[in-house]
Amino acid sequence: MLESFQADKAAGCGRQNSDKEVNEMYKIGTFNKISPVGLDKLTDEYVIVEDQNEANGIILRSYDMNDMEFSEDLLAIGRAGAGTNNVPVDRCSELGIVVFNAPGANANAVKELCLCGMIMAARNVPDGIAWAKTLKGSEGVGPQIEKGKGQFAGTEILGKTLGLIGLGAIGRLVADAALALGMNVLGYDAFMSDALKEQLPQGVMVVEDLAELYPQCDYISIHVPANDATKGMMNAAAFAQMKDGVIFLNFARDKLMNDDDLLAALASGKVAKYVTDFADDAVLNADEPGIIVLPHLGASSAEAEDNCAAMAVTQVMDYIENGNIKNSVNMPNANLGPKGSCPRLSVICKANAEPDVMFKLNELELANVVCETRGDYSYILADLEDKTIDLQVAGVIRARII
């Protein structure tokens, strides 16, 4: 089913798929425990293999692939979740391997845990639970509880102001739920657009600068990806602009925090509580009572695991069978719909090679062609009349006939 692409192997022509029998099944490798709901999406044209070197596609959750070597048969990697820090995305791009994720599939699960964390922090629930357990086996528990419960009295979230940093799928759901609970919601997104504003729940006050958000909020929750621009963005300068006693929630990524500055803000009382879904050494070893640590439970619901796996599997299948790309983190989206009876050409190339590839295709006067570029890479998808085409073009990374 994955036929070799008959292009001359001139210098710079790129990576070619080895010949395969027409009736050979597509091979899928897995890491971690993948939900059966996702794997059940695979048709009888697919087989799950243990040897990852045989795989045409790999589905995984949090397994760290950064040190793995990839075979030339590997076409796609599907991350059953949003973050791809465990996948060597840049190296995959260089090899012509499309990396998919599942944005939004776990958004509701993270939203619910974020709300849980906010209320736990506001009402001192973890401390109260821990204290109640110390009463086990003692006499006169009732009077002790009535006498001691006052030390855990907290505040309600009704009427308080929540600041959201990042208004993607999760941020928008948190905003909607917080508004329903009677909170005021301020939102900031570095990539704010008119289209994004239209997706926001009515009632969200959008700010253009974090400096406007920080001093107004009783709670701040961050929902942005971890990258070079956001690493350590929550630092002393940011904390200094916040309200005294702010409750900060991080269900996004641990690398967003400057740990030393965070601990200093907790020690000074600037940050009253820090709720995080990332149990790293910095917070686990800290002697600060205001830290509430969860063991990365954000997407750990049965529903989220099902949704993420189903999305990842479906996207990998669509790329393998039809060449369509949706929700890739390293290649542009492109779609020609289901493949018909004619052969379909799929080309991944450097962006500067795209004009030369398109020149070759334009000579064929094809009716069904899509060409998209993202950063340094271009992706071309075209329906052909013949299974053979000459592509002696430098900069082509992977080309295949489907």
Identify what each model region corresponds to.
Residues V22-A102, N235-A237, I247, N258, ...:
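An N-terminal-biased, well-structured beta-alpha scaffold segment characteristic
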Residues K111-A130, D176-M183, A310-N324:
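Oxidoreductase and adenylate-handling cofactor-binding alpha/beta cores
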Residues N184, A240, D244-A351, G375, ...:
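Rossmann-like dinucleotide-binding domain for NAD(H)/NADP(H)
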Residues C349-A367, T388:
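Short amphipathic alpha-helix segments
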Residues Y63-M68, A190-L284, S300:
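Rossmann-like adenosine-cofactor binding region
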Residues P103-T161, N327:
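Phosphate-binding beta-alpha-beta segment of Rossmann-like dinucleotide-binding domains, i.e.
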Residues G171-R172:
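N-terminal Rossmann-fold NAD(P) dinucleotide-binding loop
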